[in-house]
């Protein structure tokens, strides 16, 4: 018994749902008929709806309306509204694919989800640029001043890519300047006057990587400084007095006479 009562309740609920859908369809069909006629008063809307629902024994008005719907069905805007929406969506997606290329392949699903979550209202269509700027961060902003949106979008992408290249160039230049500063600190002013080619710079970097701090500039040893302080300019004058290769023969002849005169004092 309990199962039978439960089944009856389910049937009543299902029947009420079907009745509501039938009533909605009947009212919509009768509205289409009255819209199609030149004089909407020729068909009684209430009588047509009741005949469609089966609450009146006569079906004269409903039969007339049904014939009219079958003849002029493609002309009704309600029938074509779904097709129009689908075609408009396809056209929009095709245009976006043309404008932004692979960008829509990568982020198209995200933008479609955003459109489904936040649909644009009719009163917001006039301010479409502001809505797109808020939604997509200004990247998909429409330019209302110029008509060629494709050219504008391509210019925008070129500017974005150009800024990326400029940033990469700036970072590369900054790294090169930092390397130059390090080289100038390490080698003093010796490397400033040299204008090297990129190939020489690469070779210098390889040498630096290979030998590390071995190539750093090293000062004179302490014993050389003490030696220089002790003997002063005597060594310079002695080096200047040494003969060249051309004067070697004459000097070899004069050496015995000097040794006879000064003995072993001039030996070094």
Curated annotation (Swiss-Prot):
Keywords: Cleavage on pair of basic residues, Cytoplasmic vesicle, Disulfide bond, Endorphin, Neuropeptide, Opioid peptide, Phosphoprotein, Secreted, Signal. Residues 1-24 form the signal peptide. Proenkephalin-A is cleaved by CTSL to generate Met-enkephalin. The N-terminal domain contains 6 conserved cysteines thought to be involved in disulfide bonding and/or processing. One of its GO terms (biological process) is response to ethanol. Spermatogenic and somatic cells. Disulfide bonds join 26-48, 30-52, 33-65. PROSITE patterns: OPIOIDS_PRECURSOR. Residues 197-208, 218-228 form a propeptide. The record marks 111-113, 133-134, 215-217, 219-220 as: Cleavage. One of its GO terms (cellular component) is cell body fiber. Residues 163-184 are annotated as: Disordered. It comes from Mus musculus (Mouse). It is found in: Cytoplasmic vesicle, Secretory vesicle, Chromaffin granule lumen; Secreted. This is Proenkephalin-A. Its main location: cytoplasm. The modification Phosphoserine is found at residue 252. It comes from the Eukaryota. Belongs to the opioid neuropeptide precursor family.
């Amino acid at each position: 018994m309990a199962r039978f009562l439960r089944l009856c309740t389910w049937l009543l609920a299902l029947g009420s749902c079907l009745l509501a859908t039938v009533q909605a369809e009947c009212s919509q069909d009768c509205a289409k008929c009255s819209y199609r006629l030149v004089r909407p008063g020729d068909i009684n809307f209430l009588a047509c709806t009741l005949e469609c629902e089966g609450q009146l024994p006569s079906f004269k008005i409903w039969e007339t309306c049904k014939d009219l719907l079958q003849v002029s069905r493609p002309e009704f805007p309600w029938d074509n509204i779904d097709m129009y929406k689908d075609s408009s969506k396809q056209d929009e997606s095709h245009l976006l694919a043309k404008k932004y290329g692979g960008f829509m392949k990568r982020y198209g699903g995200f933008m479609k989800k955003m459109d489904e979550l936040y649909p644009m209202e009719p009163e917001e269509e006039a301010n479409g640029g502001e809505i797109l700027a808020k939604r997509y961060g200004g990247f998909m902003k429409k330019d209302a001043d110029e008509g060629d949106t494709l050219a504008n979008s391509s210019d925008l992408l070129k500017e974005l890519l150009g800024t990326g290249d400029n940033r990469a160039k700036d970072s590369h230049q900054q790294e090169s300047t930092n390397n130059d500063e390090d080289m100038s600190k390490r080698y003093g002013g010796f490397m400033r006057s040299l204008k090297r080619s990129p190939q020489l710079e690469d070779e210098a970097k390889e040498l630096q990587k290979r030998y590390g701090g071995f190539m750093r500039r090293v000062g004179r040893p302490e014993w050389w400084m003490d030696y220089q302080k002790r003997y002063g300019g005597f060594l310079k004058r002695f080096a200047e007095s040494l003969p060249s290769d051309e004067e070697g023969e004459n000097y070899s002849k004069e050496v015995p006479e000097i040794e006879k005169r000064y003995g072993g004092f001039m030996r070094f």
